[in-house]
Amino acid sequence: MQDYSVSGDFGQVKFYNTSLSSGRFKSTGKILCMGWHCVNPLYSISRPNGLDTNLLLLTRRGKGDIAISGKEFNALPGTAIILPRSTPHSYRAAQGCEWEFYWLHYNGGHTQAYTEDILTAAYS
């Protein structure tokens, strides 16, 4: 997939394809792609079956509403949220808000164990 930048009624998105799967990343995992979004409440993503990758969302500005396996979270500036692979989720800009965030899809190697350790520590 090629890099792209798209604007529309929903806001603006940028996508960067990467292949950081060699060298030191090979044994620990792979950053598959990353990007930046600055969106309004028209932007909404719903994945009832989740993804086949882990997804890290980093809020820079505004507010996002995120649902993970039926639990609701607010993504405020400075918030990092991990959406584990194969986990149902949805996210959108909060009503009346613009939401600017960075995202990163990663998978492979030791990333699943790291993700589980981070989530266990966060919720224990």
Protein language model features and the residues they cover:
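Ligand-binding loop in jelly-roll beta-barrel domains
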Residues: G29, L51, E72, S86-H110
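Generic protein-terminus/edge-of-domain signal
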Residues: M1-F73, Q95
